[in-house]
């Protein structure tokens, strides 16, 4: 093969093996596997996931959600705090596609509750150490405010809590990755237990490639969302 311009070259076999290994780990731990289509923003690579039974995906933007919805995906989470300026874009999605948005403040909830007309799933973003966005896990008074606000909008359905331990990428060893992962799990499990009586079907969505690759402990989690494990482009 002669390459005369910048070209993405993949070893398809290795990528598919990586996908199968992560899918098998999710099955082994009875977890929903909702991979983050972050690096592999490709409808074709998306079909590799479908071959191992993946039906739900994660993306980082409304535009990518639209791209994959047009490619046939029917259950998509946009896993960053939602930009309220994009409400009109959400209304353009077909009701055939289940959409989940992520929030971390009441202003966002009130805005989407008023401006978004379609049925929409809502995850509350929790900070478990990365400190980039989200509500601190122990601030249940703030979480309660969001839940009360959410309850005012019948077309918005609270799904659960979502976190991303992005600081595992700065870890210097597997041991440090494990420590970060376990700390995050404990914090999310605390919330799951705290709200169990109010929301018995509460989802706990976690997922970064380092933790999901190394760990065999997913206590309390219901869903994993690793992304760049497909290429391991760390």
Show the residue positions of the predicted features.
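Generic N-terminal amphipathic, Lys/Arg-enriched alpha-helix
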Residues: 1-10
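N-terminal glycine-rich anion-binding loops that anchor highly charged ligand groups
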Residues: 14-44
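Acidic, metal/ion-coordinating pockets
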Residues: 16, 20, 107, 185
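CE4/NodB-like, metal-dependent polysaccharide N-deacetylase domain
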Residues: 20-28, 119, 187-199
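Residues at alpha-helix termini
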Residues: 29, 52, 71, 197-198
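Residues at or immediately flanking beta-strands
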Residues: 32-34, 121, 203
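Active-site-proximal beta-alpha core segment in soluble small-molecule metabolic enzymes
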Residues: 36-170
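Active-site loop/helix belt of alpha/beta enzymes
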Residues: 128-234
């Amino acid at each position: 093969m002669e390459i005369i311009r910048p070209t993405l070259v993949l070893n398809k076999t290795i990528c598919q093996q990586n996908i199968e290994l992560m899918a098998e780990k999710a099955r082994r731990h009875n977890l929903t596997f909702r991979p983050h289509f972050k690096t592999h923003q490709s409808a074709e690579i998306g079909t590799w996931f479908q071959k191992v039974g993946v039906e739900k995906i994660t993306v980082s933007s409304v535009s990518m959600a639209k791209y994959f919805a047009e490619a046939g995906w029917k259950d998509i989470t946009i896993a960053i705090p939602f930009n309220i300026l994009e409400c009109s874009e959400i209304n353009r999605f077909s009701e055939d596609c289940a959409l989940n948005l992520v929030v971390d403040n009441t202003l966002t909830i009130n805005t989407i509750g008023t401006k978004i007309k379609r049925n929409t799933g809502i995850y509350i973003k929790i900070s478990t150490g990365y400190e980039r966005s989200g509500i601190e896990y122990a601030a249940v008074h703030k979480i309660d405010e969001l839940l009360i606000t959410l309850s005012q909008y019948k077309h918005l359905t609270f799904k659960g809590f979502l976190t991303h331990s992005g600081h595992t990428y700065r870890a210097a060893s597997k041991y440090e990755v494990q420590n970060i992962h376990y700390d995050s799990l404990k914090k999310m499990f605390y919330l799951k237990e705290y709200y169990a009586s109010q929301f018995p079907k509460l989802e706990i969505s976690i997922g970064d490639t380092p933790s999901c690759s190394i760990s065999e402990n997913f206590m309390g989690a219901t869903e994993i969302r690793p992304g760049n494990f497909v290429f391991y482009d760390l």
